[in-house]
Regions:
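Extracellular/lumen-exposed scaffold segments
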Residues: 1-213
Length: 213
């Protein structure tokens, strides 16, 4: 059930057939991430969608940011506080996404529908475990702000990462489009409580760079 005045979390699970993949919010050199056009009840407000950490897939020299297996996108919805128990809340979305193998791509679309009822906000143990498993695949927020510097065709990114946290072959997935060359090699080194990633810059100089390490 859902509770008036609280935040409801929606989970959109994408189930993949073997050898098929879909794309992250920044798909990389090719592909398209999922798009959702929502219709929500009056007064409800949708927050930013939370994505799992993607995987790298290089095809014909092009870097793709993909999901090779089943995964879920999480979306917070603020529910109006003046709703009486028993109020019905219809949630609808028109979805479009691209599903690919290493040989073909198929544009997909679908209509999503969910009818909820305002109640006491109780969550079943099974649903809680399911959402906990999905949240475990999200990127964790940094303890501080990352820094970046562009020098000609090179980009250096300093990501806060405590020395006590191990990192094997880290890779920076840029959310900001056209800031780095996605398929270019990345060199990473630890300097104190930071992981320094150096790679090839691309496009015009950006004043903001976001991503996932």
């Amino acid at each position: 059930g859902i509770e008036a005045g609280k935040t409801l979390w929606l989970g959109l699970e994408l189930v993949h057939q073997p050898e098929w993949h879909t794309y992250w919010r920044n798909p990389g050199d090719a592909g398209v991430g999922i798009s959702l056009n929502w219709t929500l009840p009056a007064g409800a407000k949708l927050g930013a969608m939370r994505w799992p950490v993607p995987e790298k897939l290089v095809v014909a020299g092009l870097m793709n940011h993909v999901f090779n297996g089943d995964h879920a996108l999480l979306l917070p919805v603020a529910i109006p506080k003046d709703l009486a128990p028993g109020t019905r809340l219809p949630i609808r979305a028109e979805a479009q996404w691209l599903a690919c193998t290493d040989k073909i791509c198929v544009p997909e679309r679908g209509t999503l529908a969910l009818d909820l009822t305002v109640g006491d906000g109780a969550v079943t143990p099974a649903d809680r475990a399911r959402f906990d498993a999905w949240r475990a695949k999200l990127a964790l927020p940094l303890g501080g702000q990352a820094l970046f510097q562009r020098d000609g065709t090179r980009m250096r990114i300093a990501v806060p990462l405590p020395a006590s946290v191990s990192a094997t072959d880290p890779w920076f997935f840029a959310e900001t489009e056209d800031a780095i060359a996605y398929a270019a090699p990345q060199k990473a080194e630890r300097v104190g409580d930071r992981s320094i990633v150096e790679t090839e810059a691309r496009g015009s100089e950006a004043d903001r760079l976001t991503g996932v390490l």
